[in-house]
Amino acid sequence: MIKKITKVTLCIFLVTLVFSLFMAWRLDVFVKIDEKKPSTCEAIELSGSAEDIEIDYSNGAAYLSILDRKGLIQGKDVQGSIGRIDLKNMPWEIESVFSGEGLDNFRPHGLSIHGNTLVAINHPKERGKDPESIETFSISNKGIEHDKTLISPLLESPNDLVLVAENKLYIGNDIMFNSNINSFEKIQQQLGRPYSTIVFYDGANMSIAAKNLASVSGLNVTKEGYIIASETNAKRIRVLKQLQDGKLEKLGAISLDGSPDNISVSGDEIIVAQVASVSSLIQHFISLQKGDYKPSPSKIESLVFESDKSNYVRKREIMFLSLGEDISTASVGAQWDDKLLIGSITDDKIYVCQLGE
């Protein structure tokens, strides 16, 4: 009997140990941050944090999703805006081009541009209760003008989106609000089981384009037309093929060391922001709730995409890696000429670094 009890105790201990090590790995507890960053960087202060940055390469402008997300974490009633930078004129200045005029609420998240159309995810004040929406805008020389609001029950927890035509787009749901799974499945979801979806809007209706993804926090399209999606909980970028009916076919994935967020695309280059340490990010959010500030590491990586390679990557390079004391919680990196623009989940600034020095 004693031997049986000992075996059972040993099994429980081993299972607990394996689970603890697995969770420590998922939370990046053992990750060591060896800083690598350009020698010349400067901050441009904002009224809130720019969680997403979308560059209009045709017109030389950057659009920023601005919201006081620190205030939001602390329970404040905040409203956001879309900012614009004229990249052709130095020094760069932030111009507010939309502050929610005509809307009851404006809390922007992911952005996308195609031609003269800009779209933004808009979160309600009561997330998980009130409907999420997509706001569409027309771009002109005068700025941007709000066109319409798109709503669908399929937009459960939208995080990012990508236009593939001026009236067609894909929207990625993360895991924050998912009413289609039970409590046990939510635990499995946190452990990495894929329950997220990508939604397709065809100009009139929305439908599910892809299922069983591990929390989609970034979406973009390559020059060949492949949809690439950040699967944050799986530390990978999923590569998907567009089908004629708007559905997406899973082809493969790009493995990453960090948990990916927003993705920018310029030619063959994919620039992906990553959470280098999930445990540090959690501590950062907890500190903000307490009115303190504890930085979280920031990571931006460049991937040269090649569709006919087995791992889809011809070259990798760390563009920016820091402990977060310069800019914390980096959520997006976008390149204009020889400059890297970095946005953050919570820091009220963007960080601009000179590349190639």
Positions of PLM-derived features:
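Asp-box/WD-like beta-propeller blade repeats and closely related beta-sheet repeat scaffolds
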Residues: 97-164, 172, 176-177, 183-185
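Beta-strand-rich domains and repeat architectures in extracellular enzymes and scaffolds
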Residues: 42-80, 327-332, 346
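Blade-loop segments of beta-propeller domains
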Residues: 50, 68-71, 75-115, 119-124, ...
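Short, conserved, GDST-rich strand-edge loop motifs in beta-rich repeat architectures
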Residues: 64-78, 121-129, 171-193, 273-297
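Loop/turn-rich, solvent-exposed surfaces of beta-rich toroidal or solenoidal domains
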Residues: 257-320
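A short helix->beta-strand "capping" segment at the edge of beta-propeller domains
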Residues: 27-49, 94-96, 144, 312-323
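Beta-rich, blade/repeat-based domains predominating
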Residues: 47-56, 100-115, 152-168, 192-197, ...
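Beta-propeller blade signature
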Residues: 79-88, 131-140, 188-203, 292-309
